[in-house]
Amino acid sequence: MKSESVLLPRKYNSREPSFGKAISFICLLWSLFQLWLASDFPFYLSEITKLNLVFNSQEARQIHLAFGLGLGLLAYPAINKINPILDKFSQFFLAALAVSACIYLYIYKLDISNRAGLPTSIDVFFSITGMICIGIAVYRSLGLPLLIVASLFIFYVMFGHLDFFPESMKWKGASLNKASWHFWMQTEGVFGVALGVSTSMIFLFVLFGALLEKSGAGNYFIKLSFATLGHLRGGPAKAAVVASGLSGIYSGSSIANVVTTGTFTIPLMKKTGFSSEKAGAIEVASSTNGQLTPPVMGAAAFLISEFTDVSYFDLIKYAALPALASYIALFYIVHLEVIKLGLKGLKRNTPARSFLNKFTSFIFGFTALGSIGFIINFLFSWTNNFSSTFTFMLAISLFLILYLFCIWIASKKPDLEIGLTDEEINNLPSVKSVAVTGYHYLLPIVVLLWCVLISRLSPSLSAYWASLSIIFVLLTQNPLKAFFRYKKLTFDPFKQGALDLIEGLQKGARSMITISIATGIAGVIIGTVSLTGAHQFIGEFVETVSSGSLVLMLVLVAFMSLILGMGLPTTANYIVVSSLMAPVIVMVGAQNGLIVPLVAVHLFVFYFGILADDTPPVGLAAFAAAAISKGDPIKTGIQGFSYDIRTAILPFMFIFNTDILLFNIGFISGLLTIITVVLAMLAFCSAIQNHMIVKNKIYETILLVVISFSLFRPDFWLDKIQEPFDKIQGNQIFELIKDNNNILNLNENNTVRVEFVGPDFDNPDKLVSQNSIIIFDKNEPVNKRIEKAGLFLNVNNNDIVMDEPFPGTALFQEMKTFDFYADKPVILKTIYISKNDRLPKEIFFIPSILVFILIYLNQHIRRNKHNRTQNEKK
């Protein structure tokens, strides 16, 4: 997220106290409302009071946007000042109109549903009012670019029939009544899927992050990272990478990460020898990668899950390896920069531990935690068989026991000061002395991960329980520490906990103002696509420009994401590009004989939307880092993007090799993939940095690029030496179809690639060829599989002639390329079946790894030779 993450609205601090308190109070109400929505209390209270205290999904969206628009128009003043009194009046007036337009839908929901599609004058009035208000809110809080994009889509809906539109873009256009109803009065527009995800999921995760930050966890992670890594060469830079990664677990904002961790890490990086631009760039690269880190991954992660119909658990699994590899690679890049600059680390006052000691401690800790987790999971599974209530009480009891134990340990040490003190910089504290002060901060994160990954609860319910756990920590940590330190119990620790909780709730809601507005206006874009089919002609245009090349199309989509990301928030950018391009990429992939999972395409768009945060000339994260480092923001952005090139290649690789996403692979294959992907990233980083142990020779850089590519795409080389498919043509297809008992040998994905040839829809005299991927049921005869796929075939001489697929079948959309009613028929020319007797693609890992080792040894010899020469000179 970009401007979605702004914690304090522009000009917020210039308000008079009473106005600021009013906004803070509304923010508090919003957070409490969202917690109310996620809890079971409305159901219990409704049963007791006989009142309807439960809000359905549509009602929740309406109230959610009412809060977001109202706060957005109050907290973000007009950019061009006219008169203070008039400006204030306009803010209150616009906020009241926006809230009224949302609440109108809630109050008159039954009347509106009864006249579906037939709006009254008052319906149209409130629809237009709501659209104008959300447009003003977008302009004030998110800037002009997103407003322009949304306005263009609305203009196309209203005036798509005009002559200045190309023939391929024209559509019949919508009347004012139809457009207003579509965008405001139903769930196809503003109150659509995007706003629904914001209401049910995004808010709770943002709130959890705000509460965790307020509890002191952010400061704890920064100090722990410095205590662990600060003594290494270039320690502050390496600590920045780890701290941003830890912050990314609960924060989905690159700018928030830069502002939070960069305030401490950037000055220290400069102090150890990094230039202002490089210090800022390292923080930017670390923070943008924080948005890729599961489980939060920014607001777009939940939208990806919703749009692709992939469970949130699976999405986390798919995103885990790319995020891990990206962070390891960034850590390695920082290490290479440190070597080239000859930097040292910070001093520490504890003796160094041997590698064997560290490794033994790690294995022991990992085994102990794994064993405890296994025992707890087994215990919960066993008790859940006869009483889910008992399991719930047992879980709470375990949480309380662990929490009290962690607080007791933390109470033995003084509380951590905010930021790094001069004493800590001059003499780094031991890891243990810092770690024990904040074990209790890890418990809410464990609750979140346990609920999502082990218990498989919904994202919203997982975030709800995690939020409750951190609320409990906020309220009790100070009183309990005072109790364990044998201090006299006063009201002050309780008061401080309550104030921290209130501020955390307010901070979470403030962070959501722009997210709610962005997801609301994004509904206009999605609504336009659903109403007009705009994605079809845009997809056809991009497909024409790319000449049907999947690689070129991916490059164009990447540039589109980067360019739009310069002006749009990550969430809106992702929605725009994925809505228009995701189906086209999947289709073009099929035509090129490649099965591209929809979730991989959405992650591709998501990655490049995030990378726009440090892409000059606009990258907002780069500007935030430059403000702290006092460096040049453009140079910071360029340097940051050069570090992020390693992240930019990952989406291209996992489109062609979905193993990188751990997509449908076993444990052993997954383990091998993790090792090779990390090694590939290290090789690529050595190539782009032109350094491994010493400076690369030209041939070494070239070899490292080839090694990286081979580890990412071993199938590329295999396809060059062995045909990937068996081809079945003409009479062979006829024989297969005629034999009802024939079971075709399919590949492990139960898919085949089919080539069609027929008259072009736009020019029937021209024959065109198209490839499609069809998923078959492996256990059925060929003829049954073909019918289920929507292939209606007839035999004409030696040709297999295809009739037009029925609407709703898998091939209906893809086959629009052909004219089925021309003089020449559409024929099924070839079926391609993956060969099962090919060499394993993993065989190409062996030479790649061997060459990598040889390069390493060669550079090691060169370094030793250089060191001996230097010693002889001395």
Per-range role (PLM):
Residues 1-114, 124-128, 329, 708-712:
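Conserved, well-structured core domains of diverse proteins
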Residues 2-18, 27, 317-510, 623-712, ...:
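Long, contiguous bundles of hydrophobic transmembrane helices that form the permeation core
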